[in-house]
Amino acid sequence: MTPLVLLPVLLILQSTAAPQTAPPTAAPGNPTAVISTSLGDITVELFKDRAPVSVDNFLQYVNEGFYAGTVFHRVIPGFMIQGGGFTPDLVEKPTHPPIRNEATNKLSHTRGTLGMARTEALRSATAQFFVNVADNRAKLDHHGFSPEDFGYAVFGRVLSGLEVCDRIAAVPRHKSGPHDDVPIEPVVIKGVRVIP
C-alpha cells in the first residue's frame, strides 16, 4: 500500500479505538496522599469537604510518621484490606483518643473508597483505616442510628493503585493469635506522605 492509502485506514482505526480515560484527580481543596507499601504505592484523595474530622485525624497520624512500619493486618478478598494500627509482629501501636464517627456524611463504601476502621463501639475509630476492594454499601454504609445500622465513615478514595489493593487482598493469609485473615508474609506500610 502507498502512504496515501494507509492514511485513511489509520484515521478510521484511530476514530474507532476506545477513548483513553485520564486517571481521576482530587477535587479542589481535598488533600492527596501516597500510601507506600511493600507491594506498591496507593495514591488517595481525602474528602476534607465531607469527612473533616476523619481526614484531620488521618493527616495527624501521617504528619507524625505513625503509619511507617505498620502493616495491613486484615485482608479479605472480595471485601477490604485493613491496616495502619499494628506492627509486623501484630503489636498494636498506641493512638490518640477515638474520633467522632462521620458515617452520616452520605458517602458510600464503593470499590476503592477508604473507611475508618473501628470496633463495635460507634465512636472508636483511631488510626486504622481500610480500603474497600468491592462494593460494600449494603454492609458498611449508614442505614440508621442503631449500632448495627450506623455504619463506618468513608473519608477518601483511591486515585491510583487500586491494583495494589487487589494484590494485597489476594495474598495468602492465616489466623495469628486472635487475628483472622492476617497475611502470612507481612504487607508493610513503608510510609504515608501528603502530596503538596
Q: Predicted segments — roles?
A:
Residues M1-V9:
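Sec-dependent signal peptide recognition
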